[in-house]
Amino acid sequence: FRSCANELLKNTLPVLYDELERCQKSLEGYLEQKRAIFPRFYFVSNAAILIILSQGSDPLQMQPYYEKVFDSVNQVEHDKSDKGKILAIKNISGSDEERVKLAKVCLASGSIEVWLGKLVIEMQKTLKALCETAAAQCAEMSLGDFVDANCAQFALLGIQFNWTAQCQEALEKAKQNKAIVQDTNRQQLVVLQELSSWCLNDLKTKMNRRKIETLVTIHVHQRDVFEDLARLHRSRKGGLDAGDFEWLKQARFYWRPDAKDDHGPSACVVAGC
């Protein structure tokens, strides 16, 4: 109680509080500048950002913090002879690992918020290139070979590309070929049965099992969607075509060489109205 009555303390505490407020505002302003450069920092706490920024001079020290700023990326692979070069991104879960090699080496030098932004761009360019490859492969390879050759994201995308292409072709040709809609409906069931049969096999890793189960889950929905369309086609006078709203409102996946995105010509387009 005697300390609380001390005049010096009573006069000093308000000053210290004002200084603390000033420091807090300065810190918020500093972190806002960093967030403006690398917007993913908006989803990270102030304390975590300060730790990340303090590691900027050594890219290897960033390893524990990638999962705070990226989804499904919790490590990167550095060049063994030059730690400033990032060669690949990884998703590691227990003993399982999913690795994607970057199309172009990313240099982890300079301010950490700057090179993290460059890493995002290289990741996007790499995934776009893999998307283009998946779009070309999915119609040419067997289902099993295609799924085995691609990580989960692109195995799923390839199945969605195929489903969209097959269903759209059936609806476009429905007036000339009376059987094509039902044939395509049966084809989607065959795909689902093949995917489901893999779940009974030894898939080696939990990550691979999760990948196959995801493909099954999504294709169950896709198969149900087209089954409903096939039923509507049978019941409606004149049937359906590819311009019908019942088809256009579905999520459809295309690789468009004539489209473009932030990284140049051609693009993956997800359509739906």
Regions found by a protein language model. Give the residues of each.
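Amphipathic alpha-helical packing elements
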Residues: 20-76
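Short, charged/polar, low-complexity loop and linker segments
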Residues: 1-7, 26, 95-104
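Extended, well-ordered alpha-helical scaffold/bundle regions in very large, multi-domain proteins
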Residues: 1-12, 16-19
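Extended, charged/polar low-complexity intrinsically disordered regions
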Residues: 63, 67-273
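Short interface patches used for recognition in eukaryotic signaling and trafficking proteins
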Residues: 4-8, 34-35, 47-50, 209-213
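Extended non-catalytic scaffold regions that mediate assembly and binding
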Residues: 3-5, 40, 89-90
